[in-house]
């Protein structure tokens, strides 16, 4: 009957909802302990687009194209998944908002396109309310990275070997990520979300 249909629906959605709630709780605990990386530039690389556009240390990046930026990792991930693309960057300095278009330069030594953004390994530890807000952003971040990774795989931008589970996804967003966070904790968190998205 009608009741059994709703009962079946509730059973189907209960698993994914519970998994996302668990991921949120884990993100909250994680951020309370190690903090989060704000999208504030520690500097800009000389001779690269960010410097040439007048950006400088202390600028806070708010948006790249139509994607809102909450972590410095958001910048790294977006530029990795849009390698070589000109991007519109919205940033804030001393309470004023600015917008500029950056076209990356190819770095022969490293073998990839660069905009010249420099981040910091420093983490910000916020209030309980702030950590709750950034926990939502954390879950959103990993969902977006996972989806963008799959799009890159389908589009032929990366190989299956590059996408070998959560480790492959993490490798896509750069070695600096591993150096700037408590890597083990994030791997556990990422695996929880990975399982949630694909097995729920």
Tell where the protein language model's regions lie, with residue ranges:
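Membrane-entry signal-anchor segments at the cytosolic-membrane interface
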Residues: 2-21
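Functional transmembrane alpha-helices
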Residues: 2-6, 105-199
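Residue-level recognition of oxygen-bearing side chains
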Residues: 5, 25, 49, 74, ...
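Hydrophobic alpha-helical transmembrane segments in multi-pass membrane proteins
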Residues: 19-27, 145, 183
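Cleft-lining beta-strand/loop regions that shape enzyme active-site pockets
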Residues: 24, 28, 75, 137-140, ...
